[in-house]
Structure formats: C-alpha cells, structure tokens
Amino acid sequence: MNKPLLWISVLTSLLEAFAHTDLSGKVFVFPRESVTDHVNLITPLEKPLQNFTLCFRAYSDLSRAYSLFSYNTQGRDNELLVYKERVGEYSLYIGRHKVTSKVIEKFPAPVHICVSWESSSGIAEFWINGTPLVKKGLRQGYFVEAQPKIVLGQEQDSYGGKFDRSQSFVGEIGDLYMWDSVLPPENILSAYQGTPLPANILDWQALNYEIRGYVIIKPLVWV
C-alpha cells in the first residue's frame, strides 16, 4: 500500500474509533458478554463534582448483576458507578460507598434511568421511568474526583480497565446525558419524555466517544 492510501486508512480508522457526534435516535448495542467490548465516553471534566444528574435509557434481558455506567479516576475505582444488582434493584456508588433503591418493574423491558447526588446533603435519588424512588444518604460532603475514565458496557476495577465478564452489560444504551447539578423534577421528567436540557458533562446530541471491541450503533426502536 502506498503512503497516501496508508494515511487515509489510518485516519479513517481513527475517526471511526474516536468520534464526536449527534447520536439522537440511536443506541449503542452491546451484543455479547465479554471482557473487551465497551465504549469510552470522553469529557473535559477538570473540577471535582459536588453535584450531578445522570440520565439514560437501557434495554437488557440480563437477570444477573451488571454495570450500567462506570466512572473511575486515578487510584479510585467505583468513584461513581451505576450498577443493576438484579431485577428491580439499582445501586449508586460514590467513592466506593453505595446505596441501593428498589422498584417494581417489568422484565425484560426498556427503562429510563435518572440518578442524582448532592454533596452538601448527601442525598442520592433514582428516578425510574419518570417516577422518583426513595431518597438515600450517601457520602455527605464528598467530592467526586475529576479527570475520569467513563466506560459503558463494562465495570472498571482499575483506571480504564480490569474488566470482569460477569459484570459486563449485554443490551442497548442510549439518550445519555449528564449535568453538574441536581435537576429539578420537571427537568428530569422532560428527559424521560425525550426533551432533555442541554447537558454540560455528557450530551447524547454532541457525544465524544471511543468504541472498543464489538459494539454497534443502531437506531433506537423501543421508545
């Protein structure tokens, strides 16, 4: 292969693997269990988080535990982790500590998940399909470290790696947004209804991401 064609091939591969794009109406599909398949979400977050709200849609027929959103920093695993323990049980980890919220839900079925946390009060709250669950207290006064590695599809036990097949996600994830504030109920309901506010940490309509392994982008057909 001559040099111009080689560089075009390399550039095309980089653009495919490292993209910044509007994913409206689309999802990441994770078709299999693995220790390799994942998506890295890139954000220029330079300051520790004192508050946040994270919302996304997911669809899986797994009955075992799995990671939905894994945020690690240097030397700190489970700095921020959204984890499904089993059907009807969702956990939020902040700084390796966790709370779990329970909800009656159909299985298997698509779900819209929002979770918020506020450092000053320590209050963490899940919203499932537009309905708030019982508030819990978690790590009052703590700050979530900046410069994270954020992974979909796997649970990190190190900074960007050390994955476990038994915690991998199989299914679809889309409409993911993250803000550096606790959204009021009306804005969470707007996200559930498909009209979210512009997000300043992660925004599905302007997402910087990197696909690793067998992950496919497909149309969202289950909302």
Curated annotation (Swiss-Prot):
User: What CDD domains does this protein's entry cite?
Assistant: PTX
**What does the note under cofactor report?**
Binds 2 calcium ions per subunit.
An example GO biological process term is: host-mediated suppression of symbiont invasion
Q: Which InterPro entries does the UniProt record give?
A: ConA-like_dom_sf, Pentaxin_CS, Pentraxin-related, Pentraxin_domain
Pentraxin (PTX) domain sequence ranges: 24-223
The keyword Signal appears for this protein = yes
User: Can you supply one Gene Ontology CC term for this chain's record?
Assistant: collagen-containing extracellular matrix
> Cross-referenced SMART domains, in alphabetical order?
PTX
Q: In which tissues is it expressed?
A: Found in serum and urine.
Can you tell me which residues bind Ca(2+) 2?
E155, D157, Q167
A Pfam cross-reference name: Pentaxin
Q: Summarize the disease involvement recorded for this protein.
A: SAP is a precursor of amyloid component P which is found in basement membrane and associated with amyloid deposits.
Q: How does it assemble?
A: Homopentamer. Pentraxin (or pentaxin) have a discoid arrangement of 5 non-covalently bound subunits.
- Tell me what this protein is called: Serum amyloid P-component
